[in-house]
Regions:
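Canonical Rossmann dinucleotide-binding motif of NAD(H)/NADP(H)-dependent dehydrogenases/reductases
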Residues: 1-10
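Substrate-binding pocket helix/loop in short-chain dehydrogenase/reductase
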Residues: 69-70, 74-82, 164, 175
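Active-site loop-to-helix junction immediately N-terminal to the catalytic Tyr of the SDR YXXXK motif
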Residues: 73, 119-127, 139, 167
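Active-site helix of classical SDR
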Residues: 93, 129, 137
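Alpha-helical segment proximal to the catalytic Tyr-Lys
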Residues: 98, 142-146, 203
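Residue(s) in the substrate-gating loop at a strand-loop-helix junction
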Residues: 113
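Short C-terminal tail/terminal secondary-structure segment
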Residues: 118, 195, 206-219
Length: 219
């Protein structure tokens, strides 16, 4: 969506990948990034700055799960999820927000989850990290609104991605019974919401959490 609207898209991953091939845009920029490493983030910032590619729109969508019932959850299960989902969010945003402040324009869009809003059995670590993202985004919105920087959250529900492939067809039907729209969402549903928040049409929307979940969680 961003590429089709004329944005220069920058994608990151721990491993090697070709973003241009994935989205059909030869001009897309691919980079390796380890959210656990301040040095890795620093190097990416330097690379993008040298290419005059520092982003005005930052989409934080990295996330991992290590599901386990709380009574059986190991310390490392908690630490790893918080480190990636929350501390990684802090590090990346801290690094890339300063140019936005200088330019007096920016969009920070953080991808949370319905689990962070309503909780989910077996996901105390994941739900906590995604819920904290909401508080992070609201506080950032209050601090940086005067600099024309918006900070919002998109909270997807059950979406047809690799993270839901563990469900078989019968399980998907059962889960869908609790969704008013009776189906899983698509990646495009989420992308369109992100695109809207990045657009000029959303220039007066900040500190908000938008659920893309077919009505699973209403508040």
């Amino acid at each position: 969506h961003f590429s089709k609207e004329g944005y220069k898209v920058i994608g990151t991953s721990r491993g090697n990948f070709n973003l241009g091939e994935l989205i059909g845009d030869d001009g897309a920029f691919s980079a390796q990034l380890d959210l656990m490493s301040k040095e890795s983030i620093k190097n990416l910032f330097a690379d993008l700055k040298s290419e005059d590619l520092l982003p005005s729109v930052l989409v934080n969508n990295a996330g991992i799960t290590k599901d386990q019932l709380f009574l059986r959850m190991k310390d490392e299960d908690w630490d790893d999820v918080i480190e990636t989902n929350l501390n990684g969010l802090f590090r990346v945003t801290k690094a890339f927000i300063k140019p936005m402040v200088k330019n007096k324009f920016g969009r920070v869009i953080n991808i949370s989850s319905v689990a962070g809003l309503m909780g989910n059995s077996g996901q105390v670590n994941y739900s906590s990290s995604k819920s904290a993202m909401v508080g992070f985004s609201r506080s950032l919105a209050k601090e940086l609104g005067s600099r024309n920087i918006t900070s919002n959250v998109v909270a997807p529900g059950f979406i047809e991605t690799d993270m839901t492939t563990f469900l078989n067809d019968d399980e998907k039907v059962e889960v869908s019974k609790n969704i008013p729209m009776k189906r899983f969402g698509t990646v495009q549903d989420v992308a369109k919401c992100i695109m809207f928040l990045a657009s000029d049409e959303a220039n007066y929307i900040t500190g908000q959490t938008i659920s893309v979940d077919g009505g699973l969680f209403m508040y």
